[in-house]
């Protein structure tokens, strides 16, 4: 008997309250890095109704108008309609950002462990980070999360073009359920789209549009069957959305940001954090390693885990799991990984070229699986696959 199960993943649109916060936090980070690549940034955002609160710790030489950066980020999302309670030009902004604690910076900037070179950068915090890859899609990502991202991205593309569906508004969510047989995705069983809309559009119009212009356009036709269920705005109405409808916080969509629940997550959010924070940089490195392992044909699925201690430059552990899909021994894969890659925070930053204002490109539709801008999203490259394959022999 074949092993059959259904796995679901969701994505959210740029106007979702939590994504609004991620967008603002990464916009502030990029503004800092544009002028000072060594900026230390931990920017958290809260939104509700017409209020934006930014809090956290920033140490930078950059000089810019925080309010304008925040308003520009909101404007880019699309909260500019006259009837928006949360409006780019009208929100009240509270800024309670302070400098990074000297107790943290001394461990990040210099040695923390005996015998380590003074120039070595320590990890910005303790914690564990995961990277994951599989051969289910061209992007070497799990199918459910990639399909959900495709739907969300297409909704936003159509909304911002402002031609085909002028009634679309920024807040949206998508969810895709995929049936697996013997570990392989074979069909889509259910698709859910909830999209904010103008008050005067009929539900039937929204339903027809989402099915014909979004779902059938974005998802593989061979995986949509006569039994695939489409649920469009299941409550029947979604006029009040965004921060008017719900509060938002930076870092509350970490599963959307990563692997849709198929690969594990260490718990640390990405947005608003500079690359000295291993929550972000080591998670990117984990993806880089796992993707190259799969691209090298060493395994069909690969998950990598790192763990760090604050101020200490070396990871305290490195773990690789291929879930029995490996084509060579796991010992060979682990040996190859540790030979080809360096997991010290400073080396991660150098290898992935992270001291640049690239992070706003990561905020929406997943930090992983974006292969159309490898100059910025460097952890999606597969340039180490050949070296891994050679080292694993």
Residue ranges and their predicted role:
Residues 8, 68, 75-239, 364, ...:
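Glycine-rich, mobile lid/loop segments that gate access to catalytic sites or pores
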